[in-house]
Structure formats: C-alpha cells, structure tokens
Amino acid sequence: MKKLEGKVALITGAAVGLGKGIATVYAKYGAKMCLVDLLPEVEETAKELRETYGAQIVTYVGDVSNKDHMKEAAKKAKEAFGEVNVACCNAGVCRLAPFEEMSDEMRDFHIDVNIKGVWNSCQAVIPYMLEQGGGSIVIASSVTGDIVADAGEAAYAMTKAALVGLTKCLAVEYADRHIRVNCSQLGYARTPMVEKMAIESNPDNPESAIQDIAVGVPMKRLADPLEVGELFAFLGSDEASYLTGSQIVIDGGSTLPETMSI
C-alpha cells in the first residue's frame, strides 16, 4: 500500500514550483487531491498528474488570502472525496526591496498571502479534520526569518517567521484531537519564485545570481521541488504519526556554516 493511499489532501499554490512538486509526489503515493491556485494553470497540472499517475484530482482556482475561497476549496475536496486528511499550506510570495523603499502595499501583500493565506487554509480544513477524528497540516515556512535573513527580505522574513509561531500554537491546541501540525523550513529551491527573485537581484544575469546562491550551499545546488514534496509526503503520512509542532529544515546545509572562521 502506498504511504498516502486513502488520504485526501488539499494543496495550495499547486500550479507551479514547490506546490507542483508536492502535488506530484502526493500523486505518486496515491493521494486524492484538491489542488488550489490563483493561476488557471493549476488545471494543466491536474491533467498532467491524472495522465501520469491516474490520480483522482479536483481543482479550485482561487485566492488563499480570501477566506471564502478557501472554505469553498475545502468544501469541494470534502464533497468530492468524503473527507480532508491533509492540508499542505504551500502558497507564498516573496518580493525584494530595501526596507526604506518597501511600500505598505508590498508589506500587506506578503501578510495577506503568507500569513492570512495559511491562516485561512487552516481554518477551512480543521472543522473537517475534527469531524473525522484527526488530520495533518504541513505549513511551508522558510529558513529566512526564523533562522537567517538577508537585506531586502524584511516582509518575507517577517511573514515566514510568523508561520513558525502559528505551527507551534496549532500543534498544541489540536494535539489531543489528533491533528498534527508541522512546518518545513526551506532554503532555496529551483522554482519560478526563486527565478523571479534572481531577476530582481541581477536583471542583467539572473542565472549568475542563482549560481551564486548554489555556491553558498554546502551541497552546492538548490533543492528540486520533488525533494520538498517527499518531506511534505512524510509529514502528511502516518509515518509521522508522533510528530507535531516540529520545524524541519530542508536547505542542503545552507544554514550550517559559521559566517566567520579562523
């Protein structure tokens, strides 16, 4: 039996990048899914996974920062498959700017997607999980904010660090009702979002910016979204049945080196 067979997962930000990687691994392991994204390309991702893995998938095109949208997405998963066992709260944004130049609109954009989006997703699925006697929530945080930070990332770092606190609070609140809540803390992965950041950092040679990142990682490369998907699959499965409130770093060792040495 595949590790996610019989599980129903709601995955946000599932059209491209990390979300598509997570959805691909979940399909490989037999999960039924509701894929959520603001991008209509989520339909193409679903079609691809149905054809490749025979996965049972419904989609919802909507905005995670809109509470009603997330309630509708969770309801769609429930109506299609009978329950919601796992929520992968992956949707997120990152825009770079010097702090003194960062607009209120840019700050609020990060808060709306990175914090409110996860909040809304959790509030949408938890009632179903309580009704069915448990579930697993996996939140995509980051090493940025809670462990490390770089100039220009104030809004992103602030919002991703907040998700660690949310993870721990929800884990404590729902542990005795069999809902596990964990978060991944990702370094850099080769995704459209990172490629966009590279363009913002070095418009003339974005590939050079990506290679500069890889040089600073002990493993000398960025993560593949499928590797992140494997972590999300473990946390969503019964293999992680005694794991809650955890922060799992998946960064190729990038946060390990001392910044200064003799």
Model features per residue range: what roles?
Residues 122, 159, 167:
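Active-site helix of classical SDR
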Residues 98-99, 103-111, 209, 213:
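Substrate-binding pocket helix/loop in short-chain dehydrogenase/reductase
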Residues 102, 148-157, 169, 197, ...:
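Active-site loop-to-helix junction immediately N-terminal to the catalytic Tyr of the SDR YXXXK motif
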Residues 3-34:
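Canonical Rossmann dinucleotide-binding motif of NAD(H)/NADP(H)-dependent dehydrogenases/reductases
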Residues 127, 172-176, 241:
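Alpha-helical segment proximal to the catalytic Tyr-Lys
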Residues 3-5, 244-262:
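Short C-terminal tail/terminal secondary-structure segment
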Residues 204-205, 217-228:
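A conserved structural motif in NAD(P)-dependent oxidoreductases
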